[in-house]
Amino acid sequence: VGHLRIADDDVVDRSNLQRQILHTEARIGLPKVASAAVALSALNPRTSVEAVRERVTAANVERLLDGVDVVIDGADNFPARYLLNDACVKLGKPLVYGAVHRFEGQASVFDAGRHRGSAPCYRCLFPEPPPPEAAPNCAEAGVLGVLPGVIGLLQATEAIKLLLGIGDTLRGRLLQFDALAMRFRETRLAADPQCPVC
């Protein structure tokens, strides 16, 4: 990977440290993208890291994805997930999805923009976002600290496979992980012919 673009408008908070290993106590209060850029550059100085301190919005999502080969969804909110999905379908970019909640996580590759009719998009699986009261954030619901790392590693693996054009990606499959049972489950996904996006 030669270039990473990271977009987020949040700052590092103490509550992030147990589940976000790129950040440290010394960087509390710094923009998350700046903290992540420091950590990632230390891990691999040959990869350029572009830190964009912006929230993903309808007004900027296409600009943020311009020149990007693969999009990795690390969003912690549903509006950003739907914006990324819709833009990736429109722009023909693969979206590597990952989500965590309490003791469970899931990952998939949504690539409907390049595989119209044969691959689902995020909206095929989740047509509408849940109401806010049904979707607490990590601080409210709690998340097992290592779980974002497990799901993040799966996402990184899928991104590398997409970039190199090797192996079978999770396109058309949802991989679910239950940390309490230490069990993975795979569900086949189909494109929704009624999906308004893909």
Feature roles, as predicted:
Residues 1-198:
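Adenine nucleotide-associated cytosolic modules
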